[in-house]
Amino acid sequence: MARVKKGVTARKRHKKVLKLAKGFRGARSKLFRPANQFVMKALRHAYVGRKLRKRDFRRLWITRINAATRINGLSYSKFISGLKLSGIEMNRKVLSEMAIHDKEGFAQLVETAKQKLNA
């Protein structure tokens, strides 16, 4: 049986890592070991970042909705409570977009929520 050496496989793996390390500075993009370490770290950061992005956007949407509801004379929590009571199921992303681009429609939603809270 022939002896199998890992030259081709290692070269492929090294090239793959160095390709991912493109744009890193210094040895982190030129040498395999530092590149491999920082690519692994970068991938971990990217994974965490994808989770954080969801939280950040939800926080942004809530902040926008809160600002718009306060302009219309209601707090965010009361607005959401009123929407739930009136059976309107819109997610925060859509509500945020409405608050920015369709102020009249959003004002109607706030009025609906107010009526349900007072009823």
Swiss-Prot record:
MF terms in GO: rRNA binding; structural constituent of ribosome
One matching Pfam family: Ribosomal_L20
Domain of life: Bacteria
UniProt keywords, alphabetically: Ribonucleoprotein, Ribosomal protein, RNA-binding, rRNA-binding
GO BP of this protein: ribosomal large subunit assembly; translation
Gene3D superfamilies: 6.10.160.10, Ribosomal protein L20
GO cellular component: ribonucleoprotein complex; ribosome
Function: Binds directly to 23S ribosomal RNA and is necessary for the in vitro assembly process of the 50S ribosomal subunit. It is not involved in the protein synthesizing functions of that subunit.
PANTHER family for the chain: 39S RIBOSOMAL PROTEIN L20 (PTHR10986)
NCBIfam families with a match to the protein in the record: rplT_bact
Protein family (similarity comment): Belongs to the bacterial ribosomal protein bL20 family.
Name recorded for this polypeptide: Large ribosomal subunit protein bL20
Organismal lineage: Bacteria, Bacillati, Bacillota, Clostridia, Peptostreptococcales
